[in-house]
Amino acid sequence: RPIVLLGGGTTRIGDPSGKEETRKILSEAQIVKNIKNIQNVFKIFLKTNNPKLKPIFVNNYKWLGKLNYIKFLREIGRHFTINKMLSFDSVKLRLEREQSLSYMEFNYMILQAYDFLELNKTKNCLMQIGGSDQWGNIVNGVELIKRQSGNQVYGLTTPLITLSSGAKMGKTEKGAVWLDKKMLPPYDYWQFWRNTDDRDVIKFLKMFTDMPLNEIENIQENNINDLKIILANKATEMLH
């Protein structure tokens, strides 16, 4: 069964990966609201009639909010060296550019590793999946679990979604596309895909629709505007 980890605890800190400045600290009310909305979106894409595949939703604030600092340093912190933590791109780039990196953010990688350990112990989670920018954090979790329990676990990452311009698509990036209809109405969501750069249309048809690859190959020489409409229709149907 898929386990959806909601970052009610770690979002209070903010992941520095790929960021040039400290993330804005959200209020408690905003965090609770965001968690609820994110869970509702995941339910749309993970809907199933098979009870064995029904997703499990967990909020890491459940365990991170109860941590004893001294005990955590003794049992978990001792497995992390400053040397290795400084080698991570998210840290190294900030320091090289003489940009601020708070102690709070510096600890994020340890907390994410601890999440994996907790899920392995309580849910028998054997694999963590995330974007490629999370590879280092995932490896930290794999190594922590091996040191703590000897269990063999795995990590799987997917490439970050980028536009032909090289810009990353993400919720904190300018022009992000939101899945929550309260933040982006269905028509605006459709319009986002309709306005896709010509160079990205075929790639996005393969990534964001359930069209068979052979069908996409058969139509890829069609008028580009017709393809954009197909992309917009298919992507919107899957969400709304």
Question: Which residues make up each language-model segment?
Answer:
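NTP-dependent nucleotidyl-transfer catalytic core
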Residues: 1-134, 139-142, 148-154, 167
